[in-house]
């Protein structure tokens, strides 16, 4: 039985909070799309690289996902990630298919604080 979008995102959020890159990437379809202001990343290898960069910018961050609006197979998300040296705030949209994330858009700002 495929997981619901809510279950997939719960797993995804747990992996992000733990900084577990393997678990983060495992939530995506093999041919998933990650759409950012810098362009489109296709597939798990590119998604791994994108998340590795983000997690390196804000290591050991405290993550919060205060706004989560699910509608069918879509999630609108607002998030923050805070460390002793930086704060990131972002807005994402996810599209789920089957048991994974099929498409994600992301836009965030990163502010150095320390």
Residue ranges and their predicted role:
Residues 1-30:
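Short, low-complexity N-terminal intrinsically disordered segments enriched in polar/charged residues
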Residues 3-4, 35, 48-114:
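A beta-strand edge to alpha-helix "cap/lid" segment located at domain peripheries
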Residues 13, 39, 67-69:
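Structured beta->alpha junctions
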Residues 31-42, 57:
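A short gly/proline-enriched turn/hairpin at secondary-structure junctions
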Residues 41-49:
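Short beta-edge strand/loop motif at the mouth of beta-sheet-based domains
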């Amino acid at each position: 039985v495929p997981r619901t979008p809510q279950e997939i995102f719960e797993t995804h959020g747990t992996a992000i909070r733990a900084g577990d890159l393997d678990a983060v990437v495992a939530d995506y379809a093999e041919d998933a799309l990650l759409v950012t202001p810098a362009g489109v990343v296709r597939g798990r290898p590119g998604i791994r690289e994108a998340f590795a960069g983000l997690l390196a910018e804000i290591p050991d961050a405290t993550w919060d996902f205060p706004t989560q609006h699910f509608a069918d197979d879509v999630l609108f998300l607002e998030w923050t990630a805070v460390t002793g040296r930086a704060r990131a705030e972002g807005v994402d949209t996810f599209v789920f298919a089957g048991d994974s994330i099929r498409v994600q858009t992301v836009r965030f700002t990163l502010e150095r604080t320390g």
